């Protein structure tokens, strides 16, 4: 069995509902604990027992492959009993409300609920109705805190720091919970954040979040240390936000020519799933400057760290 963690960090919050409200110390503590799990996950014995006897329920109202499987793996490696609740076959499909679902689940005494929902604020609402800890695995266009944490860990491991870096977040900022969480985290950690998108894909008043705004890739990528591409979320679009996928790629898709606008040692990220040929081409996505596969690896480590940090606050922990 693997050794106990060296970090004694305890997150001073019962839930992880977003990056908003986390301090620099909170973020740094989670990243430092995550580093231990990166090393653990590269060993033959990947098990710890910090969640032994605990029950983790993954409740996903939106389809997910990466996030749900990452949380499942994280919980099992920490010794938790993990249940994936199928929304498609649940009472929710039969008309049960979110609050009814929360009350029903709470009666089963889960220790940790990992929740993804299509509506912004739904996870926070559910958290008010349960006794255990709740982790937001993405709620509408609001937040996706563990994605921002894994992105920060990936950046820190490859650049040695976050503070002072120029980070360009490019694409469908309007519909992206990943963008919002990353902006909050990166600003807290002292990065210089720039969003790059056509006007139709920028939230009104985005400047108030403390970011620079660029509406073309040449300006947006100039001097960037990190280029973070976002998926074009057509499932959240009701109107014509972009003329066509091919035209979008022509102006805002990342290829080698546009990547050359950034610093020579710039690194490329994408939260996945990728639309190849829409927001990024395969040469860049699979190239030497890409961190996309590493982001997936960091995701398991970060989610293990979050689960452990919250578990330390549970009764009888």
Curated annotation (Swiss-Prot):
Where on this chain does L-aspartate bind?
94, 177, 231
Sorted alphabetically, the keyword list is: Pyrimidine biosynthesis, Transferase
The enzyme's main class, written as a single word, is transferase
Q: Does the keyword Disulfide bond apply?
A: no
**What does the entry give for GO biological process?**
'de novo' pyrimidine nucleobase biosynthetic process; 'de novo' UMP biosynthetic process; amino acid metabolic process
Its UniProt entry gives the catalysed reaction(s) as: carbamoyl phosphate + L-aspartate = N-carbamoyl-L-aspartate + phosphate + H(+)
The EC code for this enzyme is: 2.1.3.2
Tell me the superkingdom of the source. Answer: Bacteria
Q: Name one GO molecular function term.
A: amino acid binding
* Positions that bind carbamoyl phosphate: 66-67, 116, 144, 147, 272-273
InterPro entries, per the entry: Asp/Orn_carbamoyltranf_P-bd (IPR006132), Asp/Orn_carbamoylTrfase (IPR006130), Asp/Orn_carbamoylTrfase_sf (IPR036901), Asp_carbamoyltransf (IPR002082), Asp_carbamoyltransf_Asp/Orn-bd (IPR006131)
Functionally, this protein is described as follows:
Catalyzes the condensation of carbamoyl phosphate and aspartate to form carbamoyl aspartate and inorganic phosphate, the committed step in the de novo pyrimidine nucleotide biosynthesis pathway.
PANTHER family xrefs: ASPARTATE CARBAMOYLTRANSFERASE, ORNITHINE CARBAMOYLTRANSFERASE, MITOCHONDRIAL
Read off the NCBIfam families from this record: asp_carb_tr (TIGR00670), PRK00856.1 (NF002032)
Q: How does it assemble?
A: Heterododecamer (2C3:3R2) of six catalytic PyrB chains organized as two trimers (C3), and six regulatory PyrI chains organized as three dimers (R2).
Entry similarity comment: Belongs to the aspartate/ornithine carbamoyltransferase superfamily. ATCase family.
Q: What's the protein here called?
A: Aspartate carbamoyltransferase catalytic subunit
- The protein's organism comes out as Bradyrhizobium sp. (strain ORS 278)
The gene from which this protein is expressed is pyrB
């Amino acid at each position: 069995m693997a050794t106990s963690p060296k970090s004694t960090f305890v997150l001073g919050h019962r839930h992880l509902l977003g990056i908003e409200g986390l301090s620099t110390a909170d973020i740094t503590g989670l990243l430092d604990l995550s580093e231990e799990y990166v090393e653990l996950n590269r060993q033959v014995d990947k098990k710890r027992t910090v969640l032994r006897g605990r029950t983790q329920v993954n409740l996903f109202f939106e389809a997910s492959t990466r996030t749900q499987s990452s949380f499942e793996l994280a919980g099992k490696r920490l010794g938790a009993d993990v249940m994936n609740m199928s929304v498609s076959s649940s009472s929710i499909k039969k008309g049960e409300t979110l609050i009814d679902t929360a009350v029903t689940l709470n009666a089963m005494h889960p220790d940790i609920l990992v929740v993804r929902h299509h509506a912004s604020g739904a996870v926070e609402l559910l958290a008010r109705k349960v006794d255990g800890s709740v982790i937001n695995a993405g709620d509408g266009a609001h937040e996706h805190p563990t994605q921002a944490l894994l992105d920060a860990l990936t950046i820190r491991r490859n650049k040695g720091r976050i503070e002072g870096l120029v980070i360009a977040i490019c694409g469908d900022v309007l519909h992206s919970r990943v963008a919002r969480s990353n902006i909050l985290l990166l600003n807290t950690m002292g990065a210089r954040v720039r969003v790059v998108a056509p006007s139709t894909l920028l939230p009104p008043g985005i400047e108030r979040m403390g970011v620079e705004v660029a509406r073309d890739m040449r300006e947006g990528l100039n001097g960037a240390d990190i280029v973070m591409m976002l998926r074009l979320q057509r499932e959240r679009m009701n109107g014509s936000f972009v003329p066509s996928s091919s035209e979008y790629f022509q102006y805002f898709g990342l290829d080698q020519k546009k990547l050359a606008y950034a610093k020579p040692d710039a690194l490329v990220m994408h939260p996945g799933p990728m639309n190849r040929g829409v927001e990024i081409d395969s040469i860049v996505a699979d190239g030497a400057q890409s961190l996309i596969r590493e982001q997936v690896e960091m995701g398991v480590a970060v989610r293990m760290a979050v689960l452990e940090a919250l578990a330390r606050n549970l009764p009888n922990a």
